[in-house]
Each structure stands twice: as C-alpha cells, then as structure tokens.
C-alpha cells in the first residue's frame, strides 16, 4: 500500500494482517483528530463506515433518532430521504445505519468503484451537514410527534422510532436483555436505552436532540473504516479535502466509563406483557449474569466464546442439562456477549417460575463447582474451539459483506483503545493458544475467577403480567388527555395546524433539481449478463448429483435432499419436528452431547431443513424436500459423512426424556422467533390460504406447526407413543435411496472423493421401498381464513396476499422493479413515513404468489386500505429516464448481491429444482434493464387481481384486533 502526499494524516501503525491476507493501517487526521482504520486487500466488495461514540445519557432514544434522521437530507444532498434514493438507485451490497448502546455507525458497501465513492459522499455529508437543523419536520415523523386532527379528537403520539421501540418493548427477550444491562451497569451508559424507551421518547425535545448531534458528531469523535480493493490514498485525500480539514480538533470526552465492580450481586424483578389468553405459570424468565473481564483482553475474548459452547451452548452442555433435569425452565439460553466494554456472561432459564429462583442459582453454583473440581469436558472444549475457528476461517456472513463484519469487530477494541482496531480480527494465534490450554486447567481457572467467585453479578427475573400493555396505553391516554387539557385554544389550533402541515410536508416530493444532486450510475454501468448457474449433472449409481464446480477454499458443501412430495398432508407438521430432532438425540455410538462435539470437531455444521420449490413453468407442481446440509474441510469428509449416516440411521427417537426436552425447547424457540418476525409469520399464513407451496412452509414452520408443538408440549405423556411411532415410520419412509438427490459445491479435484462418500451413504440408507417413480402431490383443500392473531404486542403486522398466475397473468422482470418502487416509494411513504410503521415489505414470486406486509405498524385498517390503493397508484405512475434508471439500478443491486461458494451453489440448485435455466434468468435481467414506466403501469391489473382476492392475516395487539374484528373471518390468540 503506497501512501504518498498524505501530510494531513499521522500514520500510527502499518502492519500485515496475515489471517485476513490483508494489510492494516491505522491513522489519525492531524487537524480534526478523526481516527481511521484500513484493511486493504483484493476483495472487490469494498466497505466504508463512519461511526461515532454516542453514549446515551437517558432513555429518550436520541442516538437512535439521530441515526434515522441524519440520512434525511444534507447540505450537499438536500432531498428528503437520500438513504431511500440510494437504496433505489445504487449498486450497494450493503446500506444501513446501526445504533448500539454506546456507538452509532453508518456503513455502506459496493463492488462498483464509482458507486462506492457516491455512497461515501452521501454518508459523509449526512453525518456532518444534516438538514436536521433546518427542518424540524425531519425530527417529528422519525422520532415522535403529537397528532391532533380536530378540536374534538384525542391527541395521539406517532413516530417511526417510537413505534419500532413499542414493538421491541413488547418482547420478553428484549425486555430481559435491557434489564440485564441495567442491573450490571447502573452507573454508566449501558443503564440507558439508546434505542429509546417508548415511555421516555416523548420527553425528548428538539433542542436536546440537536445538542446531542452538535456534541458527538464531530470528526474528533469519529471512527472511519475502509476495507477492500481501492486506492486508499485517494480516498484519504478526498476525506481530508471535502470534510475533515474543515474541522479543528476539540476537547470532547465521550469515553465509556467502566462500571465499578460490585461488592455483592444485585437482584432485580421486572414485568413484561402477555396477552389475556397466555398463562402466567411457566412464563417467567430467570437469569444469572456476570461481568467478565475487559473487552481488551484478547485471549479472554475468545476463551469465553469457547466456554459459552462447552458450558451452555452445546446440546447437553452441563449448565443447560442440569437446569433442564432440575425442571427449571423449558429452554436454557444465554452465553457470552462481547458487545459491551465489559463483556457479560448470562445463564437464562426461559418459561420458568419465580419460585424456582433459589434452585436455579444453587444448580448453577453446583455445576460450576463440579466443572472446576472434575475439569471441563476436553472434547467439548476442542469442539468449541473448532467451531469458532471454522466460522472465523470460512467468514461466511450470508448476505453481509465480510469486510463489514470485520469492521464492526474492529470497534470491539478500537472504541476503547485508539491504537488497537485489529486486536480481535487477527485470531489464529489465539486459537492455537487455546488449543494448547485444553489440558492445563486454564479454562477451569477462568470459571473459578469469573463465574464462581465474582461479585459483579446480577439475578434478573422478569415475570409475565396480563393487561400490562392495556395499563400502559391507559396511562398514556390519561397523560395525553391531561396534556390536551393544559393547552389553550390557540395552542390546540396550532397543534391541528402543525399536524396538517407535517402531512403536507410528507406528501410533497423533493424538487427535481435536488433529486438530480444525488449521484447515480447509468444503465450502461450495469452488467448485461446474468450471473451463471453452476449446474453439472452427474450420477452416482442411479442417484442424481448436481455438481456446482468452483473454488471453495478446501471446503466441501453438500446438501443431501430427499424427495417427499408424496408426504400426506396430515404428516407435514411432523416433518417440521423431525428436522429439529436429527442431530440432537442419542445415536448408536454417541450420546447427544458427544454427537454435538464430534460434529463440531469434524465439520462446520450438520443441519436439517425442509425445502419447498414451486415449479415456475408448471404452477400446479412443486418439489418438497427434506434436506440435510453438511459443510466440512475436504480432508474431514469421510468423518462428516459417517456422522451423517449415524444421525440418519441410528437416532434413538424412542428416548422419551430427550424427546420431551426437545419439544419444550422447540416451543420456546418458535415463540421467540415469532416475536421477532411477525411479518414473516403473517405473510406466510396469508399465502397458505391459497398456495400449496406456502401451505407446506406454514405447516412445517408457521402457526400450524407451532400449534402442533404447543399441543405436544402440553399433552406429551398422552401423545408421546404416537409421536415416536410417527417419527420412526417417517425416518424409514424418507431415508431411502430412491428419494435421494445430492447438491455438491467443491472443486473438480475433490469431486471423486465426494462421490465415493455419496456412494457410502447410499449403501447405508434404509432398504428400498416400493415407491412409484413419479411421486405425486396429495390432494389438498385450501380455503380463505382471514385470521387475526392476538398477542401482547403494542403494534401490528398486517399482511395481504394473492396469486396473479391464477388470473391469467405471468411473471415479468418488471415485478422486480415494482418491489423497489413499492418498498421505497408508495409503501414507504404511506405505511412508514405517514403511518409510522417501522417497515413495509412486498414480494412477487415466479409462481404468482404475492404479498404485502407491514412491520411494527401502529395501524391496521389504514394499512389495509393503503394496499387497496396500489392499483390506482400504478395507473398514474410516471417516471422520467433518470428516475426509471434509478429504480432499475436498485433492482440490479438486489439481484447482484455478491455470493460466496455456498450461496452460489444454493442459487444454482434452487434454479434446478424450480425448473429455471440460464435463459430464464437472462430473460428476467433483460426485462429489468430494458424496462420503462409503461411496463410498471402495465402491472396495474396484475396487482388488482391479487388484491381482489382479499386474503388478509394480521398479528398484533389484542385490543386493536378486537376493536376491528369485522375485518376478520376468525379472531384467535397467537399463544394460549
């Protein structure tokens, strides 16, 4: 890395980052005091962020509201929402902003050099020169504002952050995590809610909000990060000339103060809301939490990641199993959290009872004492190290650029030591150290010091309370009524005028001359050719093998699929249960805890799932697969496949005790998943009213699946024999050679060895049954239900769905563009900006299945009516060449997300299973790049046909759904 003519910067360190095959650079901008860290390498997926240390001084949510609002226009880019303009019109591979308890970061990523520079420019201008000082209208809709429609109407509060946090404060898991931080750090920033407490957000004044930005959004408080293949010197010069050189360093103390250690543990009991139908028994959360050292202790940082696995995280881990065996809670979670300056280790029993608190604590102490006395299981320690190291080496973060994850990890040390941004991103020497310590008593010493004899601890109990949300709403209504009574007639008229003015402001589009200031690529900057499919058809005996040949860095990725499209409808939820038990029960050679260790020592993971693949050219047909996934180093493949054989063929499903534990744990985890993804649950349910594909997904992972799991949990003793018989029969029916097909990602040189292992597995499956070669789908009766599912949330998830193919329409690439237009224009403006919902999504599948859904939405009927307005919006849709190009670029950005080998293989295999070839994918891309606004208008009737079906499903606040019960055919409790 050549650094010339950079007198504006002081080079603090330049060093090789060998583990990342990169070069590291640490700088300080001399004039402004800005900190800069660079990881330079040949990765074209470039990453930039600027972050600030933003310690919250109260729980009004000011750091969070600023994060939302600085991206609502700036000096150089004065449009109302540059963030949305970039989403619609850039080739970004990541674009967002994130608020943490003590920091806020603004990251972007792109593989296109020009686009990357454009993104950097908009973000730098946003954080340093935001329009929040010019327009109070920016603060109100994103943060909070009072609304008054008429003199006789009640005053209400609305705001995107306000509603987002109302949703967060309805979740037991979120409430618990918040109280854990409050309990352990009463004297520093972690005791405050940086996201905002809905009861405190209304207290934030516009002046305090601006003051927070003035204080903390200065270069001397900034952390600037660059990653990837770029001209680093050119980027540094640009930052200096355009922004940093305009500032003088100032005295600013934003350091996070360490919490003084406790002399003895503290105890806290709090409440969280449940619906009127949910039981208070078995719904308490018990937690024991400890502050574990210092984030700048590099060895401790990873050592506790390993102890997390060995003590708590692994199936059958001693803390988890002892608490389950003692009858305390249905699921034991927690572990090591390194997101704070002083990391935290938590042990949490979910679905427990307050009366078990002393037993909970005594069991923990007993287990920890035994671990120190008898020693931690060495295999468990090795498995924990191997699993952590495999994740580190593979660096597979899904759709997130790995450079972004490295950058966030830099802040784990950099935020507290200006000279140490790379402390935790270089880790291989620490893994070697930890392996050497397995037999030395090192880990036992850590347990003794930090978990057994550590007074800086807390016991946090959160108990359920029916009607808590109703109480909160009643208190808020009284507070707002009192506020209204305190206003003079003139003030009431002014509030009505302010409400009207804000709505007018929200409806006014940004001037075209301002929109033109947002930098944008041209259509010719986009690649015309679609990404290839990597499907080479091969055979292993009579079994089809789809080989996705590519460089995979010595890792083999296998998907073993079993065609179960002929599965009886009544058995579908049991398929969902089967995927959760395989790998988590005893087998012929291993106890389930030993099995987990073997999997983590020899592989990067073995997992089971169900896959639904509707055929894109035969709407009535689809593939339904039971899938087993394995990833492993090529050298470990024989051991990995032997473990897979062991799981498939010898799992002891008849172990009633273990099966009981899994069912209880599964119920708890499905409920937690529902709380975090109500939009997905609602949209899947709405689709299941008419779509076979969605019905199968819903039956194996949605509300129908949950209802079976809950019933089994409550009546296990009566139903266990039938459950075991059903699962054992299913295993013998599914795992036969005739059903099997294999997807393999590996290099050509490794394929022969892979094929030998496939042959090994085929020989060890259950004997062939008489199976009709062309397995047919069973008869299925689908019906509209239009359900409302009531829960303890303070917000709603409103879903509408339908299928356009049933009405004679066919898929077109313009639907990809419509997703961008809906998500960031029509739905964004009406559901989020005006309505106050945190999010809104839409999807148009090739088989015709379509949905619209809102996320953490204060509204219900209003949102449903907004959906009905889409055809009218499309009928009048107009976009000039620049605007249309913007939508197309945003669409291509979504289509061209960089993929690792595993993701490329998955994309290719999905295409194969759905009957898609490269010509189909290229046709879609051509339609996208060549689209006009006329093509978008042409979708009006297609969308109208979907909405005319009137398929509705809503998950949300009990009182809100009851008050609008006429919208539903059925009103139910989500949990009982």
Predicted regions span which residues?
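Generic recognition of flexible, low-complexity loop/linker segments
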Residues: 94, 210-214, 273-276, 333-337, ...
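Extended, regular secondary-structure scaffolds
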Residues: 211, 223, 232-251, 374, ...
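M16 family metallopeptidases and their MPP-like homologs
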Residues: 45-55, 81-129, 136-148, 174-199, ...
């Amino acid at each position: 890395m050549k650094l010339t003519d950079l007198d504006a910067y002081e080079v603090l360190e330049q060093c090789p980052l060998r583990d990342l095959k990169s070069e590291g650079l640490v700088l300080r901008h001399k004039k402004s005091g800005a900190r800069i860290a660079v990881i330079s390498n040949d990765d074209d997926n470039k990453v930039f962020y600027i972050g600030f240390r933003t310690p919250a001084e109260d729980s009004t949510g000011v750091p969070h509201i600023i994060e939302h609002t600085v991206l609502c226009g700036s000096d150089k880019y004065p449009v109302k929402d540059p963030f949305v303009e970039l989403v619609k019109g850039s080739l970004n591979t990541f674009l967002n902003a994130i608020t943490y308890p003590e920091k806020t970061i603004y990251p972007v990523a792109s593989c296109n050099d020009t686009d990357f520079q454009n993104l950097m420019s908009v973000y730098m201008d946003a954080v340093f020169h935001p329009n929040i000082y010019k327009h109070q209208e920016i603060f109100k809709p994103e943060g909070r504002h009072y609304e008054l429609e008429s003199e006789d109407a009640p005053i209400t509060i609305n705001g995107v952050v306000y509603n987002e946090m109302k949703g967060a404060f309805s979740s037991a898991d979120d409430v618990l995590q918040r109280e854990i931080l409050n309990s352990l750090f009463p004297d520093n920033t972690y005791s405050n809610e940086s996201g905002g407490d809905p009861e405190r957000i209304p207290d934030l004044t516009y002046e305090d909000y601006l003051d927070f930005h003035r204080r903390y959004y200065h270069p001397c408080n900034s952390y600037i990060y660059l990653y990837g293949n770029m001209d680093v010197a050119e980027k540094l010069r640009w930052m200096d000339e355009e922004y940093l050189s305009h500032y003088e360093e100032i005295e600013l103390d934003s350091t996070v103060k360490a919490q003084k250690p406790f002399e003895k543990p503290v105890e806290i009991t709090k409440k969280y809301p449940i619906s009127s139908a949910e039981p208070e028994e078995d719904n308490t959360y018990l937690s024991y939490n400890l502050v574990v050292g210092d984030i700048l202790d590099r060895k401790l940082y990873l050592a506790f990641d390993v102890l997390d696995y060995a003590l708590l995280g692994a199936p059958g881990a001693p803390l988890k199993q002892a608490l389950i065996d003692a009858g305390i809670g249905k699921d034991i979670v927690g572990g090591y959290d390194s997101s704070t300056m002083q990391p935290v280790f938590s042990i949490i029993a979910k679905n427990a009872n307050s009366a078990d608190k002393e037993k909970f604590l005594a069991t923990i102490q007993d287990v920890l004492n035994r671990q120190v006395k008898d020693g931690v299981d060495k295999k468990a320690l090795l498995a924990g190290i191997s699993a952590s190291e495999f994740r580190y080496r593979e660096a597979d973060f899904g759709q997130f650029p790995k450079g972004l994850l490295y950058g966030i990890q830099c802040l784990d040390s950099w935020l507290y030591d200006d000279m140490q941004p790379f402390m935790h991103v270089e880790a291989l020497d620490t893994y070697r150290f930890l392996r050497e310590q397995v037999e030395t008593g090192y880990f036992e010493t850590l347990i003794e010091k930090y978990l057994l004899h550590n007074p800086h601890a807390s016991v946090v109990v959160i108990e359920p309370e029916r009607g808590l949300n109703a109480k909160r709403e009643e208190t808020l209504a009284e507070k707002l009524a009192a506020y209204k009574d305190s206003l003079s007639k003139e003030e009431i008229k002014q509030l009505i005028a302010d409400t009207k003015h804000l709505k007018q402001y929200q409806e006014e589009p940004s001037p075209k001359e301002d929109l033109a200031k947002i930098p944008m690529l041209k259509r010719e900057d986009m690649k015309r050719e679609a990404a290839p499919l990597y499907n080479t058809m091969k055979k292993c005996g009579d079994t089809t093998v789809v080989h996705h040949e590519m460089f995979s860095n010595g890792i083999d990725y296998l998907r073993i699929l079993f065609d179960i499209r002929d599965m009886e409808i009544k058995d579908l939820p049991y398929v969902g249960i089967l995927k959760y038990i395989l790998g988590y029960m005893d087998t012929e050679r291993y106890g389930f805890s030993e099995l987990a260790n073997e999997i983590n020592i020899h592989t990067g993971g073995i997992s089971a799932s169900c896959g639904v693949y509707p055929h894109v050219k035969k709407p009535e047909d689809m593939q339904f697969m039971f899938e087993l996934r394995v990833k492993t180093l090529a050298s470990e493949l024989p051991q990995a496949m032997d473990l897979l054989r062991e799981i498939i063929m010898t799992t002891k499903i008849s172990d009633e005790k273990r099966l009981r534990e899994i069912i209880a744990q599964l119920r708890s985890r499905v409920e937690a998943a529902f709380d975090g993804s109500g939009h997905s649950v609602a949209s899947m349910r709405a689709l299941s009213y008419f779509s076979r594909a969605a019905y199968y997904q819903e039956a194996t992972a949605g509300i129908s699946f949950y209802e079976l799991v809950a019933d089994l949990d409550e009546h296990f003793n009566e139903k266990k024999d039938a459950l075991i018989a059903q699962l054992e029969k299913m295993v013998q029916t599914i795992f036969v050679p005739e059903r099997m097909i294999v997807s393999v990602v590996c290099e050509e040189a490794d394929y022969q060895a892979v094929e030998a292992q496939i042959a090994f597995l085929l020989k060890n499956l259950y004997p062939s049954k008489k199976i009709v070669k062309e397995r047919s789908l069973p008869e299925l009766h689908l019906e509209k239900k239009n359900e409302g599912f009531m829960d303890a949330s303070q917000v709603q998830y409103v879903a509408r769905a339908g299928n356009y193919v049933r009405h004679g329409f066919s898929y077109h690439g313009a639907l990809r563009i419509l997703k961008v237009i809906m998500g960031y224009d029509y739905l964004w403006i009406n559901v989020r900006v005006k309505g106050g919902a945190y999010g809104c999504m839409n999807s148009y599948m090739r088989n015709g299945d379509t949905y619209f859904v809102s996320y953490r939405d204060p509204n219900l009927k209003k949102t449903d009516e907004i959906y009905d307005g889409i055809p009218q919006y499309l009928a009048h849709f107009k976009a000039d060449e620049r605007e249309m190009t913007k939508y197309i670029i945003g669409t291509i950005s979504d289509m061209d997300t960089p993929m690792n080998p595993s993701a490329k293989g998955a994309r290719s295999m999905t295409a194969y299973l759905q009957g898609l070839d490269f010509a189909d994918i290229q046709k879609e891309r051509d339609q996208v790049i060549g689209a006009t606004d006329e093509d978008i208008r042409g979708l009006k009737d297609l969308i109208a046909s979907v909405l005319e079906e009137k398929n509705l499903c809503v998950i949300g606040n009990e009182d809100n759904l009851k008050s609008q019960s006429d919208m539903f055919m059925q009103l139910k409790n989500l949990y009982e």
